[in-house]
A protein has these predicted regions:
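Transmembrane alpha-helices and adjacent helix-loop boundaries
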Residues: 1-184
Length: 184
């Protein structure tokens, strides 16, 4: 389901790059959250509870290892190099005969697929999902993790996520200044 949503967002945001693409993606996430909070078919803003706790540390660790390995192999593959070429120079890649539209949409789908795996793990870890928890600030925090680690680097994104996840614990004594650290 996440991959299908990635295709839809990818098609909608096809002509955008950089900051504008991030803004549209975050806006789409906010629209989905508001829909989940307000439509009766999704249960409104109620908590979806009763999810089995299947996220044990060893299971999550091995899922993470498999996902990171697949992403690493993807980045090193011909497909991954093509996506990197599009990222570096959109016009040159297009002039070289690369179907930029196809690669951008499929990359969105693949990214959304892995995000969906993360969401599934999170749901099983929390055993309940509250739509209001996935607000704009949470999206901005996730985007910050990627930016701090480096947008073109898989290892950097992992380090950025680990750093910003550990930062609240490291800065517990200075909790009133937490947002100041994020602004830097």
């Amino acid at each position: 389901a996440a991959g299908i949503m990635g295709v839809l967002v990818g098609i909608a945001a096809l002509r955008l790059r950089g900051d504008y693409l991030a803004i549209v993606t975050m806006a789409f996430a906010e629209i989905i959250r508001v829909c989940f909070c307000n439509f009766s078919i999704t249960g409104g803003g109620k908590t979806m509870s009763g999810i089995l706790k299947l996220s044990t540390f060893p299971r999550v660790f091995w899922i993470m290892v498999v996902c990171v390995t697949i992403m690493y192999l993807f980045v090193r593959s011909k497909y991954g190099r093509t996506v990197q070429a599009i990222r570096e120079d959109y016009i040159a890649a297009s002039a070289s005969g690369i179907n930029v539209t196809y690669y951008k949409v499929m990359t969105f789908a693949i990214s959304a697929f892995f995000a969906g795996i993360g969401g599934g793990i999170y749901a099983h870890y929390m055993t309940a999902m509250i739509p209001t928890n996935f607000n704009f600030n949470y999206s901005a925090e996730l985007l910050s993790e990627v930016i701090i680690g480096g947008t073109g680097s898989l290892t950097g994104s992992i380090i950025g996520a680990a750093f910003l996840s550990a930062l609240p614990e490291l800065m517990r004594e200075f909790s009133t200044y937490r947002m100041l650290a994020y602004s830097v």
